[in-house]
Amino acid sequence: MIDEKVCLQLIDSAIKVRDYSYSPYSNFKVGASILVDDFKIFSGCNIENASYGASNCAERTAIFKAVSEGYKVIHAVCVVGSFDEFTYPCGICRQVMLEFALNNSVPIIIAQSRENYIVHKLNDIVPFEFSKNNLI
Ligand code: THU
């Protein structure tokens, strides 16, 4: 469960950062936000590249920003895509979420707006995962 106020803060943050999306190739803007320790929120947008393969998804931008500033534990994730549809994280981003999530029940908020969103648990969108726990 996630507190509704925090959930709405995450959605606001993801919608705001989506404006900075650099996506001239797909024309698909994505914004993401994550909740870390101290109730701090990091956000990020997708950043594409002429080589396509060097593009970075919004979720990973937000996560890498947080980790590189010392926040390694994710308590919640929010993703807001474009057009009136729900945008789910790609496989690579799901794997990166597994690496830093507090646990498998971390809420993943898939939002279109403050009024229209779905909350999943990380484990729902990455069942049968391979993670660092397998290496211990
Ligand atoms: N994208 C994201 O940033 N996050 C997702 O969850 C799905 C896809 C980006 C990658 C690329 O820049 C564009 O959306 C189209 O795939």
Please give the residue ranges for each predicted region.
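Short amphipathic alpha-helical face segments that pack within enzyme cores
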Residues: 57, 61, 92-95
